[in-house]
Amino acid sequence: MARPLSDRTPGPLLLGGPAGAPPGGGALLGLRSLLQGNSKPKEPASCLLKEKERKATLPSAPVPGPVLETAGPADAPTGAVSGGGSPRGRSGPVAGPSLFAPLLWERTLPFGDVEYVDLDAFLLEHGLPPSPPPPGGLSPAPSPARTPAPSPGPGSCSSSSPRSSPGHAPARATLGAAGGHRAGLTSRDTPSPVDPDTVEVLMTFEPDPADLALSSIPGHETFDPRRHRFSEEELKPQPIMKKARKVQVPEEQKDEKYWSRRYKNNEAAKRSRDARRLKENQISVRAAFLEKENALLRQEVVAVRQELSHYRAVLSRYQAQHGTL
């Protein structure tokens, strides 16, 4: 028969006894209560709760790294529970996240520093000729002090050799060539002279098609005022020829020989007039082109002189500050 709820009293622990009892008495009381049948098995939830409370009261080992201190009494011993007996309110070193450490994406990596300068690009930018290769055909290796040490990444293997960026390889060779160029600065090769006839001025010149037709020989190539060159003999002034006195020939003397001679003279005079007019037309069209080209070149000369005066002023200030080159 089941007992009423009022008669059910919790049985003593098997291994524990009342306070003040002799050691070993708890075991006898537990055995007696087990034989009498009035003991009740423990619930698993209560056992787990007591085990957590027992672990919470034990002092925890300090964890290396940044820790967070919880609020509590300053004179409380290690492992003491504060805040109404709650195990979560105890004071002492508690492991926590490193809130004061910089984030990974906020770190500044030294990859934006400029280590090398392309000397040829610098010289071309300032209108100077590029540096010639050093004698021997081999450029000296760059100084090891200026070579940045490669930083191994997280996915790099120990057997892989460090590789430099492709943009720095030609810059290092240029830097080595610059060292040999500074040593032989006085023996720099001057640029080869340019043929003035091959230089073309960028300009818009459109002559009249009728003038070009009058300046061209029929059946031949069209006259080009940009490329045509006259010889010194053609440009010499022609003397004025005096017209011969006209001789009156009587009608009875105008025979067949006279008319053939007159015909040949007229044809020769016509050819001479046509050649002279053709040459005059060519010279006039060529002169119009040269006048326009000359005006454009004068403007370029003025701009070049202004730029030259500016560079001379910069050079004089540099020499006054750093001495003669």
Swiss-Prot record:
Question: Which tissue types show expression of this protein?
Answer: Expressed in the suprachiasmatic nuclei (SCN) and in most peripheral tissues, with a strong circadian rhythmicity.
Which PROSITE patterns does the protein's record reference?
BZIP
Pfam families in alphabetical order: bZIP_2 (PF07716)
Name the residue ranges with Low complexity bias: 88-98, 154-171
Question: Where do the record's region annotations for Basic motif lie?
Answer: 257-279
Q: Which GO terms describe its molecular function?
A: DNA-binding transcription activator activity, RNA polymerase II-specific; DNA-binding transcription factor activity, RNA polymerase II-specific; RNA polymerase II cis-regulatory region sequence-specific DNA binding; RNA polymerase II transcription regulatory region sequence-specific DNA binding; sequence-specific double-stranded DNA binding
List keywords of the entry alphabetically.
Activator, Biological rhythms, DNA-binding, Nucleus, Phosphoprotein, Transcription, Transcription regulation
**Skewed-composition ranges (Gly residues):** 17-28
The superkingdom of the source organism is: Eukaryota
- Listed PANTHER family: D SITE-BINDING PROTEIN, THYROTROPH EMBRYONIC FACTOR RELATED
> Would you identify the family this protein belongs to, as annotated?
Belongs to the bZIP family. PAR subfamily.
Q: Tell me the protein's name.
A: D site-binding protein
Biological source species? Rattus norvegicus
